């Protein structure tokens, strides 16, 4: 029997050293290539690397920043990386962290989107996607279950979720209107029955991993202190960064041009992503598929599958939407289809993520001014409940197009149903990872497609 190791004392833990911007740059670049697993997996990777291993930031400060990011529209993991980069190395540190979190996935998705559109009808590729599509349906069901089990804590919140499902599934109400309605209910409900709308949030840290570069008692650095002048300057810069490319697109292609409408549409989408990418996908479907016809329902499902299997935020599926729209509509002419797709993917990524940077750089000093619980979470609690109903509607939408590819008048696709059931059991019962489920179902689909 081996001797019991002696406990690690404070003296045994090496003291943290200052981190250069170059060292941080290399870490954020690495993170951009390994950030698989959706927001939960990405936040877990950052916690392991930055809190436990490198000790760049204490757990309490890490969770305090995460609580703020959870309140914002947009991808919380990317915003958390931006926040920590900003806190450590000022504005450029935040920009570098946020950009590198997204950039690798943008390049990867542009390449995969081109492979998909160019070779999607090849039997091997078609077979893989035949199995992946039912798996994506199961993944969306799992997302509704995961968010619902965390968010629907009482009858009020269950009622909001049910009402949102009816509103979008039966009444076909626009997603922004559902979000607004839920926020109003949460605003008044938080005052009438505050115990029903109390957000869970992330609990305060109870474990220490040793001293950190940014520790619990580390004073707020000068650049992270609130200043009205800094806020006004940032607002002006943000307005310029949005207005200039929008004005150029309008001048070159007109307001009704495809790229201009993509920029405007995804700006609105960026402000509605409460609850993560799954929450905004119904809005993207309503606009990109239903209104603008930039891509088909089947392509939308395939795009989500690609987004699930690449690093970076899942909301990067918008790059796929942009690429397919620009490529198929040939906005630069038939000889420049790839260039049009790549430009469209880059544009929608810019307009989708610009608000996230502004939220962090503008709100960060306000968050750093207090380490107490954030207020005004009741509307967000109600919105999260509504998101569950919206995601369930998305699962119904995917299921319909996958299981009845020719509509209800056609036959049920039994192999797809069986693959979806296998994926659901693997995800919900055996807790298997999303990527391995997609790979397994893709291989099953390939066998079925080649055999039949």
Task: Map each language-model feature to its residues.
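Multi-pass membrane proteins that catalyze or facilitate reactions on polyprenyl-/lipid-phosphate substrates
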Residues: 1-72, 76, 83-310, 314-452
């Amino acid at each position: 029997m081996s001797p019991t190791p002696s406990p690690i004392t404070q003296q045994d833990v090496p003291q943290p050293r200052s981190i250069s911007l170059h060292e941080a740059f290399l870490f954020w670049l690495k993170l951009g290539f390994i950030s698989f697993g959706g927001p939960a997996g990405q936040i877990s990777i950052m916690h392991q690397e930055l809190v436990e291993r490198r000790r760049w930031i204490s757990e309490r400060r890490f969770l305090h920043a995460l609580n703020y990011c959870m309140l914002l529209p947009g991808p919380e993991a990317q915003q958390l990386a931006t926040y920590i980069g900003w806190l450590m190395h000022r504005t450029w540190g935040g920009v570098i962290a946020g950009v590198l979190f997204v950039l690798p996935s943008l390049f990867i998705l542009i390449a995969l989107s081109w492979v998909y559109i160019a070779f999607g009808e090849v039997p091997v590729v078609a077979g893989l996607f035949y199995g992946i599509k039912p798996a994506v349906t199961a993944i969306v069901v799992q997302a509704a279950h995961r968010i619902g089990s965390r968010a629907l804590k009482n009858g009020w919140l269950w009622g909001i979720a049910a009402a949102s499902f009816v509103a979008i599934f039966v009444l076909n109400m626009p997603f922004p209107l559902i979000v607004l309605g839920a926020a109003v209910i949460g605003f008044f409900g938080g005052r009438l029955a505050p115990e029903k709308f109390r957000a869970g949030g992330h609990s305060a840290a109870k474990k220490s991993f040793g001293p950190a570069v940014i520790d619990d008692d580390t004073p707020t650095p000068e650049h992270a202190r609130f200043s009205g002048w800094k806020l006004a300057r940032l607002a002006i810069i943000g307005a310029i960064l949005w207005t200039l490319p929008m004005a150029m697109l309008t001048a070159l292609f007109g307001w009704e041009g495809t790229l201009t409408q993509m920029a405007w549409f995804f700006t609105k989408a960026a402000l509605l992503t409460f609850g993560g990418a799954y929450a905004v996908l119904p809005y993207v479907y309503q606009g990109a598929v239903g209104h603008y016809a930039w891509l088909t329902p089947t392509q939308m499902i395939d795009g989500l599958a690609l987004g699930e299997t690449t690093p970076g935020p899942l909301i990067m599926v918008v790059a796929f939407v942009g690429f397919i729209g620009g490529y198929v509509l040939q906005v630069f002419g038939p000889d420049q289809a790839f260039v049009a797709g790549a430009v469209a993917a880059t544009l929608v990524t810019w307009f989708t993520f610009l608000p996230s940077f502004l939220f962090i750089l503008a709100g960060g000093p306000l968050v750093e001014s207090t380490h107490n619980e954030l207020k005004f979470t009741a509307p967000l609690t109600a919105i999260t409940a509504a998101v569950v109903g919206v995601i369930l509607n998305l699962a119904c939408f995917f299921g319909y197009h996958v299981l009845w590819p020719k509509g209800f008048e056609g036959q049920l696709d039994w192999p797809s149903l069986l693959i979806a059931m296998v994926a659901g059991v693997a995800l919900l019962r055996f807790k298997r990872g999303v990527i391995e489920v997609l790979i397994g179902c893709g291989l099953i689909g390939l066998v079925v497609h080649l055999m039949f």
